[in-house]
Amino acid sequence: MEDEDCYEDWMSKMPSHMWDIPLWNLAIPGSHDSMTYCLDKQSSVSNSTPRVVQVLDKYFPCIVRPCIMKWATTQEGAISNQLDLGIRFLDLRIAHKIKDPDEVFYFAHGVYSLLTVKEALTEVVRWLDQHIKEVVIIALSNFEGMNLDQHKDLIQFLIATFNKKICPKSVTPSLQECWNHSYQVILSYDDESSTGYVELWPQCPYWWANKSDPNLVISYLEDQKNEGRPSQFFAAGLNLTEDARYVLCHPCQSLQSMTRRSYSLLMKWVKQQRPGSGQACLNIICADFVGIFGSESTQLVIGLNQIEA
């Protein structure tokens, strides 16, 4: 690909012999919990947090919320900046605030976001309009506090917003197929309410180690590879996960400092991976703080497509 330091149009610059490969057999960089760069410092904790945390937040918000922000924030760059870096998989955790009379949807990870779903996805549409040969996989999940009617409202908004850019789930999406039909968005919707919508793909499996030690994360991912990859889209998560004990034992740390310390080890593992249809091949590779060292991590993932297995 030309312009090796610029990845905002990397799909359009892929060599022609890769245009007909299904996207689930390519290496695609993704961001874990993509919208946590805009968490609301003034927000109460989300309803998905443990009950004890909700009680503590009620009486000691000045202590609880800064701590949650340190460990719930997984990204720094705005969604359009992530796309500019080459990210083509967005991990969106949707929520409706409890007792909120307005039918407004937010993102949640410990606390709620400042940006609404409408604002964020409108930004994605604007970006796609300027990069007409790029394809983004958007995985929506969690749906905290949502009932069936709210699911229907959200689904109708998604279809109206992305409209003809949506790639139907009946298609085997390659770059060429998407370009031929002007498809730019693959919507994965992890809820039974999506049944019957040709525009919505099923859940995108996410390999999550739930470990704070990067060596254990790598060990988990290797175990998953040995069991065999899914037949379609799936994501391997490089993200580290703290537990209550880790947070208490490391009061001066944050998720970002933990990620920085583990970055080189995780990237060394990425360099050894290969995309493709084989049992041990990877597809989407997700990371926290995707711009922490510029475009290096996305460059590594995209570069895997140029290596012959």
UniProtKB/Swiss-Prot annotation:
- The PI-PLC X-box domain covers which part of the protein? 17-193
Q: Which Gene3D superfamilies match?
A: Phosphatidylinositol (PI) phosphodiesterase
| GO biological process: one example | lipid metabolic process
Name the record gives this protein: PI-PLC X domain-containing protein 1
Q: Which domain of life is it from?
A: Eukaryota
Its taxonomic path starts at: Eukaryota, Metazoa, Chordata, Craniata, Vertebrata
Question: Which InterPro entries does the UniProt entry name for this protein?
Answer: PI-PLC_domain, PLC-like_Pdiesterase_TIM-brl, PLCXD1/2/3, PLipase_C_PInositol-sp_X_dom
What the entry lists under Pfam families is as follows: PI-PLC-X
Organism of provenance: Danio rerio (Zebrafish)
